[in-house]
Amino acid sequence: MTETPIAPQEVPRVIVLVPAYKEVDSLPRVLEALRAQTRPADRVIVTLDPHTDSRRTAELERVARAGGAEVWHSVGNRHKKAGNLNGALSRLLPVVSDQDAILVQDADTFLDPQFIEVTRRKMAQGYGAVGGTFRGRSGGRLCGAFQRNEFARYARDTARKKGKVLCLTGTACLFRAGALKEVLEARRSGLLPPAEGVYDTKALTEDNELTLALKHLHHRIVAPTRATMTTEVMETWPALAKQRLRWKRGALENLIDYGLTRYTTEGWARQLVAFLGASVSTAYLVSVVWFLAVGAGVRIAPFWIAFTAFYAIERAVTVKSRGWRVSIASMLVLPEWFYDLFLQGVHLRALADTALRRDRAW
């Protein structure tokens, strides 16, 4: 099929790509949220990866067309979301203007009405890519509640830093088409790590890797406070551990691929801080268990009482956007602390898997 080139226009277009595989339940609301945008997209394309159950693929196509979207099908894709997007972008990029914007969003993420308007306005200020912050959907019981608190703290931290982020979110992000074309060319020329397309299908976290690629081509990125959305949470602890292991190992491997540069320094520093934090927590737990085992008992020093009080207040203040009930519940130190320990344990596992070159899968 031959695409008709889009003639340059005064107002750049916004084209949405929604890669989908099995999201039959969420896709209708995704498309509804896109139709409700204060600055509607000029074009919405749902790009389908064939499911092993052909009925599910057919249902996704029906839902997409009913929601007013175009439907594309990936062909011969073996690399999940990244491969699906690479195939779609290989069709799309040659026929769009460099100033057009391409919004890539997950098929289980619901954009708030102002998302496109806010990100498009920000991109007009010279940014190569504009992301956002997200809230967690309901569900998942205690596991989901911790994630919703975590997302609220991330949004608060991003707002405090005026949109500065280490990594663009893969849930929804607006890219300047010209920036993606530069990434593709830089991969071919060897200026960036080689890949089969815009997204590196070898990376566990393709969104993190693309962020590094854009930065190394000197594109600015940002996540405006008002660019918000709602996305899924992992509903079980094993699912959360699997997700975070992929995120943490993928981020570490991306840093290794790019080495130590002006754009990776902060990432390496965060890796070091996370490792030190996990090490201190491990040492603390081991020492407590040891003292209890030998019958020495545990004496709580005034310093630790003060530190615990500070931790409780910090936990409450950083989730106040979720309401006073959540803030009060967050002051229960032990549940929040155990969630931190859980994430630190996953981080140590990611370090070990990377060092030992264990199989990479998700």
Predicted segment positions?
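Catalytic core of nucleotide-sugar-dependent glycosyltransferases
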Residues: E150-A155, A241-T261, A312-E314, V346-A352
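Short, acidic, metal-binding catalytic loop of nucleotide-sugar glycosyltransferases
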Residues: E32-A41
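Short beta-strand/loop segment that forms part of the nucleotide-sugar
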Residues: D42-T52, W72-S74
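Short beta-strand-to-loop acidic/aromatic patch adjacent to the donor-nucleotide binding site
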Residues: V95-F110
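Cell-envelope/extracellular polymer assembly enzymes that use nucleotide-activated donors
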Residues: P12-I15, R43, E209
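Catalytic donor-sugar/metal-binding loop of nucleotide-sugar-dependent glycosyltransferases
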Residues: N208-M229
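Membrane-embedded multi-pass helical conduit in multi-pass membrane proteins
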Residues: L272-R358
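Long helical/loop segments within the catalytic core of UDP-sugar-dependent glycosyltransferases
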Residues: V75, K80-S97, P113-A203, L245, ...
